[in-house]
């Protein structure tokens, strides 16, 4: 089938709202996880992600960044815990076409060299690849099901991966992330727990 996505204009973010955001961020404690995802509204500084990570650089947090091109590249110096480009975004960053899993592993490795601790690359119908902080490469296939709505699937994958990391097992985290993304893609809305664990069973 065909999917049509309509993206409206985001709100104008005021200086007061930015100050409120910083105040909330200052409450983050060591061991917490912060997810920065998506594009930057035009009313915010283009380097807002960098400013946030610089502000929190003295804390031992797990920063997750799901963004594209310069927005992603410019935060690598802060050694984010996880970044999640898809295969097309990875190709855009380096100006090359990703033709194989080997290509993805090669260029994801370059992002690790630039500072990322873990690099998770989603490949739509071809599964996902994870290069973890311990130097291991993990490959995961896709779940079986009918795609109803792909919006939010990438965000669900990040959420599932982060939740899976609580076990300290990157192989499991990758599978839980994949199942979470699939559960959203196969639903009219967002993933639900029962569906996630049903799909997790497909991944072994």
Regions found by a protein language model. Name each.
Residues 4-16, 36-43, 59-62, 94-97:
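Flexible, glycine/proline-enriched loop segments at strand-loop-helix junctions
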Residues 3, 89-91, 145-146, 164:
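A short, flexible beta-alpha/helix-coil linker loop
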Residues 50-136:
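Conserved phosphate/ATP/ADP-binding segment of small-molecule kinases
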Residues 1-32, 199-204:
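Conserved N-terminal subdomain of the carbohydrate kinase-like
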């Amino acid at each position: 089938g065909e999917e049509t996505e309509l993206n409206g204009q985001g709100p104008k973010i005021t200086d007061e709202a930015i100050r409120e955001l910083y105040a909330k961020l200052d409450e983050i404690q060591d061991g917490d996880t912060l997810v920065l995802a998506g594009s930057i509204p035009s009313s915010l500084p283009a380097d807002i992600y960098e400013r946030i990570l610089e502000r929190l650089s003295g804390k031992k947090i797990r920063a997750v960044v799901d963004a594209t091109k310069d927005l992603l590249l410019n935060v690598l110096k802060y050694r984010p815990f996880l970044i999640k480009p898809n295969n097309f975004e990875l190709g855009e960053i380096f100006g090359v076409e990703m033709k194989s899993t080997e290509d993805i592993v090669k260029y994801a490795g370059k992002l690790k060299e630039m500072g990322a601790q873990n690099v998770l690359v989603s490949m739509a119908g071809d599964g996902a690849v994870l290069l973890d902080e311990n130097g291991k490469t993990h490959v995961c296939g896709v779940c079986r099901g009918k795609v109803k709505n792909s919006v939010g699937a990438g965000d669900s994958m990040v959420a599932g991966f982060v939740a899976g990391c609580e076990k300290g097992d990157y192989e499991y985290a990758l599978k839980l992330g994949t199942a979470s993304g699939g559960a959203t893609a196969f639903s009219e809305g967002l993933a639900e727990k029962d569906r996630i664990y049903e799909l997790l069973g497909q991944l072994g």
